UniProtKB/Swiss-Prot annotation:
The keyword Cytoplasm applies. Its EC number is 6.1.1.3. Binds 1 zinc ion per subunit. Pfam families: HGTP_anticodon (PF03129), TGS (PF02824), tRNA-synt_2b (PF00587), tRNA_SAD (PF07973). Catalyzes the attachment of threonine to tRNA(Thr) in a two-step reaction: L-threonine is first activated by ATP to form Thr-AMP and then transferred to the acceptor end of tRNA(Thr). Also edits incorrectly charged L-seryl-tRNA(Thr). Residues 243-534 are annotated as: Catalytic. It is an enzyme of class 6 (ligase). GO terms for biological process: threonyl-tRNA aminoacylation. It is found in: Cytoplasm. Residues 1-61 form the TGS domain. This is Threonine--tRNA ligase. PANTHER family: THREONINE--TRNA LIGASE, CHLOROPLASTIC_MITOCHONDRIAL 2 (PTHR11451:SF44), THREONINE-TRNA LIGASE (PTHR11451). It comes from Haemophilus influenzae (strain 86-028NP).
Amino acid sequence: MPIITLPDGSQRQFDRPVSVLEVAQDIGAGLAKATIAGRVNGERRDACDVIEQDATLEIITAKDEDGLEIIRHSCAHLLGHAIKQLFPDVKMAIGPTIENGFYYDVDLDRSLTQEDIDAIEKRMLELAKTNYDVVKKRVTWQEARDTFEKRGEPYKMAILDENIERTATPALYHHLEYIDMCRGPHVPNMRFCQHFKLQKVAGAYWRGDSKNKMLQRIYGTAWADKKQLAEYLTRLEEAAKRDHRKIGKALDLYHMQEEAPGMVFWHNDGWTIFRELETFVRTKLKQYDYQEVKGPFMMDRVLWEKTGHWQNYADLMFTTQSENREYAIKPMNCPGHVQIFNQGLKSYRDLPIRMAEFGSCHRNEPSGSLHGLMRVRGFTQDDAHIFCTEDQIESEVTSCIKMVYDIYSTFGFTNIAVKLSTRPENRIGSDEMWDRAEAGLAAALAHNGLEYEIQEGEGAFYGPKIEFALRDCLGREWQCGTVQLDFALPGRLDATYVAEDNSRKTPVMIHRAILGSIERFIGIITEEYAGFFPAWLAPTQAVVMNITDSQADYVQQVVKTLSDAGLRVKADLRNEKVGFKIREHTLRRVPYMLVCGDKEIAEGKVAVRTRKGADLGTFTVEEFAEILKNQVRSRELKLLNEE
């Protein structure tokens, strides 16, 4: 007679084993209708699964994150059901959930077209609208293998052969005539899976191995209701408009080309933004008492073997040879910073030493993963390494966190998700050391008044870390900042300092990145601002234009005055109508357009418009120069009189 304890502490006793759904029915018909699955003793279970002993139970509905993930997973099965009806010879591989959706890898002897995808989606909806029950059956390993052998599914057979113990009892989910295998749970009925959209097809190797066959990966998104789906598709449309690759081309910021995959060709305007970011971060480095250094571009293999990179990171490192020596182009800056620390004897009185670099790094990322500025092979890290004692961890991390928020707020990022990753099973150092390290990070987060999510076991083997993910205007998360403790690398590279008792001790190293990759950060802010960069970042801050040729000399004088004030200004003296010029520079997202006609010349002024079409009136050149200089100096996000 199981006793079921519900989340509110109330209990229900049954005279026989009961399923999750039966408990929901006992609570109420409305809850039963909404039940997707349950969490039994903290473990997700299907609605049909039977509870035989006393247990805690939470009912999972479409309102829960878990419920939404289950809907998405079941939509992957629905996709399998539909494609099998339309293309009976297709072979099904894997169909997991991903952020906001799902995919299914399929093996088909023809390339799927957009018309095919539309037909599959239509069939999925037709099937889901029949509201059929999903039937779960536990079978022996051999029964599962026989089932898929009979159905001609070699990939399912391979999963059984290579990933599932012979003693296991796999779960087969029956969608009418279609059968799939999964850990589950899945929806009990397809009425939960009627708000989805198939999005695209891409290539994907079986098992992610380029030596295996290339499959077709069909991506989709799924939501709990029509409103959520519509809102998500609207966000996708907005994201497409904000795509940094599209805006980067329109604004002539940069380009990529096949001869240098994953490497950026910065054009003048994009490089201007890049240098402004560097200048801004440098002011913060000075404010937070960092020294700036520059390490070599590549180092001998011997050093990378000492750090462990050669053994664990070789696939991502570019290498070259010279005079019978093998070198690796650096994928990160930390080993070089330890070499700088090692020059000269250090005392505990010298610590902490905060060492920053705009380091040019290269990683041999797979070509299929490259994506504009967001995923590149050559990038500039704004990282730093702090060498300190264990006693200084909390205060140094506190300072790092303060710096992270200080910098992010300048760009308008105030919604930041914070995660603390703790000790993994495989780690170096004693439990006491990890206790102190994790406590130090937690105390620093508390000192800054931050809420955070704990990621158990997600720390690196050499130390715990804090991650900072920016949430942008579309609700997307971008993981940029990290504060990582490292108890391993300084020791591997023989870094020591003279302690207060005259013994030699190994310093703790704190890895600290804020923007992360400058290239990627430019991609992020390009999409966040939709190319409407604040005045301090805008490549051209103002364009001065004439109405007729008679104002050309005055325009040149205005440009000189503003340029001499340190502003980035251009003249537009083309023989075009002023309305045409305004439209063109508006499309180029230039913050301010200054029009000079005979009236403005007579008054010694300029008529000022913004890129959003606001007419700000007339100003003397000196007045406008002071306004724009103040905006740049204070790094304001909005233009004059902009809401």
